[in-house]
Amino acid sequence: MPGPPALRRRLLLLLLVLLIAGSAGAAPLPQTGAGEAPPAAEVSSSFVILCVCSLIILIVLIANCVSCCKDPEIDFKEFEDNFDDEIDFTPPAEDTPSVQSPAEVFTLSVPNISLPAPSQFQPSVEGLKSQVARHSLNYIQEIGNGWFGKVLLGEIYTGTSVARVIVKELKASANPKEQDTFLKNGEPYYILQHPNILQCVGQCVEAIPYLLVFEFCDLGDLKAYLRSEQEHMRGDSQTMLLQRMACEVAAGLAAMHKLHFLHSDLALRNCFLTSDLNVKVGDYGIGFSRYKEDYIETDDKKVFPLRWTAPELVTSFQDRLLTADQTKYSNIWSLGVTLWELFDNAAQPYSNLSNLDVLNQVIRERDTKLPKPQLEQPYSDRWYEVLQFCWLSPEKRPAAEDVHRLLTYLRLQSQRDSEVDFEQQWNALKPNTNSRDSSNNAAFPILDHFARDRLGREMEEVLTVTETSQGLSFEYVWEAAKHDHFDERSRGHLDEGLSYTSIFYPVEVFESSLSDPGPGKQDDSGQDVPLRVPGVVPVFDAHNLSVGSDYYIQLEEKSGSNLELDYPPALLTTDMDNPERTGPELSQLTALRSVELEESSTDEDFFQSSTDPKDSSLPGDLHVTSGPESPFNNIFNDVDKSEDLPSHQKIFDLMELNGVQADFKPATLSSSLDNPKESVITGHFEKEKPRKIFDSEPLCLSDNLMHQDNFDPLNVQELSENFLFLQEKNLLKGSLSSKEHINDLQTELKNAGFTEAMLETSCRNSLDTELQFAENKPGLSLLQENVSTKGDDTDVMLTGDTLSTSLQSSPEVQVPPTSFETEETPRRVPPDSLPTQGETQPTCLDVIVPEDCLHQDISPDAVTVPVEILSTDARTHSLDNRSQDSPGESEETLRLTESDSVLADDILASRVSVGSSLPELGQELHNKPFSEDHHSHRRLEKNLEAVETLNQLNSKDAAKEAGLVSALSSDSTSQDSLLEDSLSAPFPASEPSLETPDSLESVDVHEALLDSLGSHTPQKLVPPDKPADSGYETENLESPEWTLHPAPEGTADSEPATTGDGGHSGLPPNPVIVISDAGDGHRGTEVTPETFTAGSQGSYRDSAYFSDNDSEPEKRSEEVPGTSPSALVLVQEQPLPEPVLPEQSPAAQDSCLEARKSQPDESCLSALHNSSDLELRATPEPAQTGVPQQVHPTEDEASSPWSVLNAELSSGDDFETQDDRPCTLASTGTNTNELLAYTNSALDKSLSSHSEGPKLKEPDIEGKYLGKLGVSGMLDLSEDGMDADEEDENSDDSDEDLRAFNLHSLSSESEDETEHPVPIILSNEDGRHLRSLLKPTAANAPDPLPEDWKKEKKAVTFFDDVTVYLFDQETPTKELGPCGGEACGPDLSGPAPASGSPYLSRCINSESSTDEEGGGFEWDDDFSPDPFMSKTTSNLLSSKPSLQTSKYFSPPPPARSTEQSWPHSAPYSRFSISPANIASFSLTHLTDSDIEQGGSSEDGEKD
């Protein structure tokens, strides 16, 4: 616009200049005459032209300018101060908080981007409560203020209604961070919809003054209400109101925590009361303005409620107080203080302390807690206990949900009559105060929700009971093991220390035996001997030993042998209290125990025949426990290890699997036969453990037995009578349950050459049990085939009386007193030496289990015996061959310390569930040639002589023995490996079958088993041998990885002949049960340990997951020396009748002698005697040598846990002759009892010096002792044993041996980890009931359960620390199902046995916790019927261990069946333990609807 005017101006100026110039030029005109006229005219004309032009231009320019000025488009706005654009400015919101700008003004809203979105939940735009129209709010008054600004009481208009609201207004000067904090503080109340949480009605965030609109609680905050109503807060109604309010406060906080919201200032002042007296947890942010006395100000001008703040949130730096943000744990602390306020009339916490005092005493020193509230109310102590839970260290505090549950329970209980079971239920509800990382519980995804939400860090142990089509499935999870006394005591591998995982799956057979025998197969004892898993598993009455139908789950944590000893002593104490049953129970306990040793050393160690002085020094019992006695060890050994293990050890392993319950029948069973009380106990144990191996063993009595002229018909008759007595008394329920078995056994015996009368008696007494086992599996035929797979070599040395007693003991008649010569005792010691020791030489029963028998042994039933038998048999052959070469070897075997002998006896007892039965039979057979009494005594004398001879030989051949053990290891590895595969897997369950501590001095079941197993060696039942070793807790043994693998034959010089049938890797052909009576302090175990060594070393666990199993192979190898630890241990020190089977091959005799030498110490024997477990005829001399003879096992053996055990036990020469202490070591079902028995004898002697296993005083995983086991006597013994254990603890070898032994069955890996006692879950009729969960499985139990069983109450009982989840699915983790199927069977049969030592140790350790926990539950179809149904298992189950032991320890899972069976066994049912902090079990108990009966009561009961 300026351009044109400038141009025009220029033109105008130019025109003016021209005009001026023209006028100037024309002005001067001279006045001349006429002549000058023309020029003037010219100038004027040019001038005119110029002027005209100038005018024209000027006019144009002027017109142009005028037009420009008049042009409307031209705007000079830039020159003006125009403020019209600023009219849109909105005045500050503070000036018009509720007034919006005029409509004509353009408004810019706050960008949504600047607003923080809720972290948890963003409500839909349609339902945005935040869109509360500001104009709908009307402020009434300001009621307080906070850091954020003002809090106003107002009204909100919604349509035609008006409601009171509380408005929190954020100050306009708030920065973005403060805005974010302001909105986040309101998030929980905006998102959560809960009746006990304050509701945020809406948010106003479209304009600067952010508003949060909350519901208004008419009665104000709870603190002011209580203070105002203090005068009226009296009476029951007001107390109930306060209790309800407490529950509502906890519920509100729990709802916040569930969605991970935290309360910024939880206190009574921030709990608001509605008009209907409902409490709402919230925060208006005005606490400080209304209750300034409750807050203190920090140097940075921040205020916080000191008296409600958790100590961990407050710290000081350079005299400046610093506070951290709230956490869930700190919220729990504040919750406790809030509840205290509620119950104390809204008093100020620590009102007697100044803020500085509170800061020092409560926050910094943490030594002051709030006193008990003044409110008088029912269970006021429990209410206060809940508050105290909230003030524990952060990791131990309960979750808000736990607090709410506890308060709700207390509130309900306060409103009803007091319940008898209140304490139990309360304990069940109590949160676990032991801190744990919830991540540790991730093993079971199904538990993740519970672990994260509820248990979280606090969940120590979780037992999951899942009801499946197969029955109840048990999953046990516990925290990663902590280094504890187990670790300290364990000399085991470094790997075996921390977390011990044990998977326990009850085998169908186990269940059926436990729950009820087949409909038509009830024993005289009233126990059926079903081969299937019973539909209903009776609950084991921990306190009612007389209940034959009682069954329980026993978990034992892998730990050092010492640990196991610790617990076994506790068990021992109880056993000692009741000497009659001590043997069986001890046997049971011992069987559970496993020595933690290296595989190589384990085998040798278990073979007490090694020359290593360590071995010799170890008491036989220890040896037995470590090796032969603990089928668990065998179980956990790998296939190779099992192969390495002599067949007898395999049998023992199988015995543990199948005869787990049989193991529980301590040698006391035999005593029980003699003494009704004992008989009862034994019967129970028998019932509990299927007598797989031993049942088969008697059937497997080999031709040697039949050929043994020494067998006294009277003895057989006595055995039979005892057996019948047990049966009639329902003591031999498991093995005796089947008359079919009895008949079969009788037939077998007849075939074997037994007189019908003898067979009748023995079958009736011991054979009934055995037959039951046989019923479970073809094991019965073992006797016939047994008749001597190896001829004389496969002699089952049955001390006439001891064997009888063993048979009487039924599965428990494992002849704890008698030491199974699992070692290579069969090595041919000069026949003369054996006969020379006629007394000591028990008749050797060549109990060879035919392959099917062994297979059946592998099945829960027959497996147990075959393992030992095969081991023994193979050993016998090897020994026979070797003995001839080096009689010293057998002597060396004999040289095993008496403790070894005791161990052997115990092991024998435990191992020879059937074996004990066999031993009885054998003894009877032995006695047959002689007059009952005369022959019995004569035989005993001979046995003693043989033992002495063996002792001499042992001294000579200790080194040879070591070599032999090595040879055995290698040969056994070749033979026994196979045998062990078959034996260890199949036989462990049966091992606990019959235990007759009385006269059964030494049961060289190992030889017989070795021989019989030798033929079946190829069959690998390793999985049964040891529980699944997968890291996955729920993994079952059945899984392929659990199969035992043949160990390198290099295992020591294991005698090739040891497993004569070593070629058969799978199953021992015919278990040869050699039961030798150990004369004074003679140890048949030495020989046995060798065999075990071979087997154990040979076997190793495939799975790298379970440290337990990993260690178990070692343990197993430890066991290997006596392949059947039971057999080893079973050798009794008690003198047996002189009569020696003339036909016994020298090796068999030697075996017998060795077995006798392996016999438990005098103490053990005497214990057995005193427990009247040894009541078997044949004057069972209570091991005359109080100090176990120190036999020097072979170097390998010495290095092996067995040798260590032997050494320790021997070192426990202080091992007092435990006349009152049962020496029985039931390695399988009664592993714990065996262990106890062993512990009583071996621990008293060697444990006093070595093993702490029996130490109940040592805190369990849960830091609890097994005092609750009801084994007060055992505990006492355990204390003695503990002292011994402590001593032994000093002797790491023994300690580790025991631990390895116990842990062996569990897993070598677990062995490596600290062995934590596994809680023993006891089920008993008297216990709480999970009846709904315990449903009979028709499929599993082909035979209808006996009416009694059906009528019986099923109960799962836990004590305070067990959390039980009941899920209606196959397995908590589906992946476990298939695995469970495979591994379950073996696990059931094997894990418990395999964990025999670890299991025992756990039983012992966790006994304290578990027994305390009272963990007992009954499962009907927890496990697949078929796999677990191995006849051995069912027999084992039918012949449960005596209740006494069972009440202390859950019976080991039914004996494992052969591979074929246990892969099938209960894929879904499993009881697994996964590493978790062993510190404690979660007190929280969740029950499924299935547990209606048990439900709350059961829950409480669980506690």
From Swiss-Prot:
Post-translational changes noted in the entry: Autophosphorylated. Phosphorylated.
GO molecular function, one term: protein phosphatase inhibitor activity
Positions of modified residues (Phosphothreonine): T805
Segments crossing the lipid bilayer: 11-31, 43-63
Record-given protein name: Serine/threonine-protein kinase LMTK2
Domain of life: Eukaryota
CDD domains linked: PTKc_Aatyk2 (cd05086)
Pfam family, one: PK_Tyr_Ser-Thr
Subunit structure: Interacts with PPP1C and inhibitor-2.
Top EC group: transferase
Keywords: ATP-binding, Kinase, Membrane, Nucleotide-binding, Phosphoprotein, Serine/threonine-protein kinase, Transferase, Transmembrane, Transmembrane helix
Protein's cellular compartments: Membrane
Record field: catalytic activity: L-seryl-[protein] + ATP = O-phospho-L-seryl-[protein] + ADP + H(+); L-threonyl-[protein] + ATP = O-phospho-L-threonyl-[protein] + ADP + H(+)
Biased composition (Low complexity): 970-984
Phosphoserine modification, residue list: S806, S886, S1107, S1305, S1307, S1308, S1310, S1450, S1496, S1497
UniProt note on tissues of expression: Mainly expressed in skeletal muscle, and weakly in brain and pancreas.
Organism annotation: Homo sapiens
CC terms in the record's Gene Ontology section: early endosome; Golgi apparatus; growth cone; membrane; neuronal cell body; perinuclear region of cytoplasm; recycling endosome
Spans annotated as Disordered: 597-622, 804-840, 875-898, 970-999, 1013-1202, 1276-1317, 1372-1469
Job description of the protein: Phosphorylates PPP1C, phosphorylase b and CFTR.
Residues the entry annotates as binding ATP: I143, G144, N145, G146, W147, F148, G149, K150, V151, K168
